[in-house]
Amino acid sequence: MALSDADVQKQIKHMMAFIEQEANEKAEEIDAKAEEEFNIEKGRLVQQQRLKIMEYYEKKEKQVELQKKIQSSNMLNQARLKVLKVREDHVSSVLDDARKRLGEVTKNQSEYETVLTKLIVQGLFQIMEPKVILRCREVDVPLVRNVLPAAVEQYKAQINQNVELFIDEKDFLSADTCGGVELLALNGRIKVPNTLESRLDLISQQLVPEIRNALFGRNVNRKFTD
């Protein structure tokens, strides 16, 4: 039985409605899938950027902490250096004051002669030569001449060896020198300074740790007292 035009139109409309519905469902499915993929990608990108931001600020925070530690360490070191500078200046002041007082030793002739004798004998033990030239301040020549016999006897008594001492009356120690002697042997190739200043310098090197301890107390953090 042949379909009428109305039936044909009806079937066509039905087919078109079905196709349209299927197309709409497919479109909705595609949209839903696209939105899901978009949300997943968006979430991934957001998380990625969040991690980057967190990593950036963690790095910045560590840099700030490190900078704080460096600044704190620098400030602490500077403070320590300032304290050390003040202490060293004070120690130097004590030694400078001692140097200024050296000249007072020479004002007492008897005491100074005793000192000169000891300085000459000490120098002889260092130089250990049979012929020695003594150099002193011009003003001290008479005093040195007076103590030569006693110095020679003390030296001979210790090592049982004779020594000839000569006073250099051409070249003298500077008048600015506080006193003491300089010993020379072998045409000046051996020289032993034993002035009051040189003795103070030697003693001060040995006593600086003790001076520091006396002025500021012992540093419990140091194992050695150099």
UniProtKB/Swiss-Prot annotation:
Keywords noted in UniProt: Hydrogen ion transport, Ion transport, Transport
UniProt cross-references to Pfam families, sorted A to Z: vATP-synt_E
One term of GO molecular function: proton-transporting ATPase activity, rotational mechanism
GO (cellular component) term, any one: vacuolar proton-transporting V-type ATPase, V1 domain
Keyword Ion transport in annotation: yes
Coiled coil: none
InterPro entries, A to Z: ATPase_E_C (IPR038495), ATPase_V1_Esu (IPR002842)
Gene Ontology process terms (BP): apical protein localization; liquid clearance, open tracheal system; proton transmembrane transport; terminal branching, open tracheal system
Keyword match Ion transport: yes
Subunit field text: V-ATPase is a heteromultimeric enzyme made up of two complexes: the ATP-hydrolytic V1 complex and the proton translocation V0 complex. The V1 complex consists of three catalytic AB heterodimers that form a heterohexamer, three peripheral stalks each consisting of EG heterodimers, one central rotor including subunits D and F, and the regulatory subunits C and H. The proton translocation complex V0 consists of the proton transport subunit a, a ring of proteolipid subunits c9c'', rotary subunit d, subunits e and f, and the accessory subunits VhaAC45 and ATP6AP2.
Purpose of the protein: Subunit of the V1 complex of vacuolar(H+)-ATPase (V-ATPase), a multisubunit enzyme composed of a peripheral complex (V1) that hydrolyzes ATP and a membrane integral complex (V0) that translocates protons. V-ATPase is responsible for acidifying and maintaining the pH of intracellular compartments and in some cell types, is targeted to the plasma membrane, where it is responsible for acidifying the extracellular environment.
Family: Belongs to the V-ATPase E subunit family.
Name listed for the protein in its UniProt record: V-type proton ATPase subunit E
Species in which this protein is naturally found: Drosophila melanogaster (Fruit fly)
